[in-house]
Amino acid sequence: MIAIENLHAYYGNIHAIKGISFQVRKGEITALIGANGAGKSTTIKSICGLLHPREGKILLNGSPIQRMSADQVVHLGVGYVPEGRRVFPVLTVDENLDMGAYGRSNRAEIARDREKMYEMFPQLKNRVKQLAGSLSGGEQQMLAIARALMSSPQLLLMDEPSLGLAPLLVKQVFEIIAGLNREGLTILLSEQNARGALKIAHHGIVMETGKVRFADTARALQENPVIQQAYLGVG
């Protein structure tokens, strides 16, 4: 579904992504793991149009998107859950969901999907008119996911969705991600929590200092002694 080919991305003179290549297969969860500063978020931002790479290609279903704007990428069916949740704090829960559907015109379908979000995230249903900035961290993360889903994506990019959450909420977030995938959604999941991410993923990409160090099935990475010692706390 997504193919990354020899991608190079910069922040000014800082070479953040150094010729990475990998694929995200349709219908699967691909986990992008690595330490802070490895290049995971930069990769996600490059795919969703927030950062334009200097070299290389990003192919969505065979078509290049690396020069497209973020709103153009959304219209192609790519949803984005940013690091740190980034909900609109002075808007209500309901208004945040409306923002997620801004590019859609069928009001009946939007209303249907909004109700689906409240069924999926019952915590939000009780806070429809509450300002997003007053929600707990876990509730804000649920809202960020629901907002991205309101764009009706075929591919969901998730940047550190477990960051800053209590262990019980982390488990809940990973269960939600796995459930979305079971419904057919393709997901690229950027995570420092390698153990949790690989547990639900089909494939994994390990990044270090802007490069791909390992790429394999999630199970193979979980069984790799180097990965176990460096990222899974084994050995």
Residue ranges and their predicted role:
Residues 1-235:
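Glycine-rich phosphate-binding loops of nucleotide-dependent enzymes
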